[in-house]
């Protein structure tokens, strides 16, 4: 929690300049560099990297 107050961002992306305060945020960011679209709409051909993109 204290990292948020001190601006410490020890988790760094090895593909760009992104950095963050925790590993789960970094793992989520790493999907942006991937070509894997694992979440698919059941009604059409739409596919996305993020599950929240399918929600209404």
Curated annotation (Swiss-Prot):
Zn finger spans (C2H2-type): 1-5, 11-33, 39-56
MF terms (GO), sorted A to Z: DNA binding; zinc ion binding
Keyword check for Metal-binding: yes
Whether Repeat counts among this entry's keywords is yes
What the entry lists under InterPro entries is as follows: Znf_C2H2_sf, Znf_C2H2_type
Please tell me one Gene Ontology term that the record gives under cellular component. Answer: nucleus
Question: What's a GO biological-process term for it?
Answer: segmentation
Cellular localization per UniProt: Nucleus
What are the entry keywords? Answer: Developmental protein, DNA-binding, Gap protein, Metal-binding, Nucleus, Repeat, Zinc, Zinc-finger
Q: Provide the function of this protein.
A: Gap class segmentation protein that controls development of head structures.
The Swiss-Prot or TrEMBL record describes its family as follows: Belongs to the hunchback C2H2-type zinc-finger protein family.
Q: What is this protein called?
A: Protein hunchback
Q: Which organism is it from?
A: Euscelis plebejus (Leafhopper)
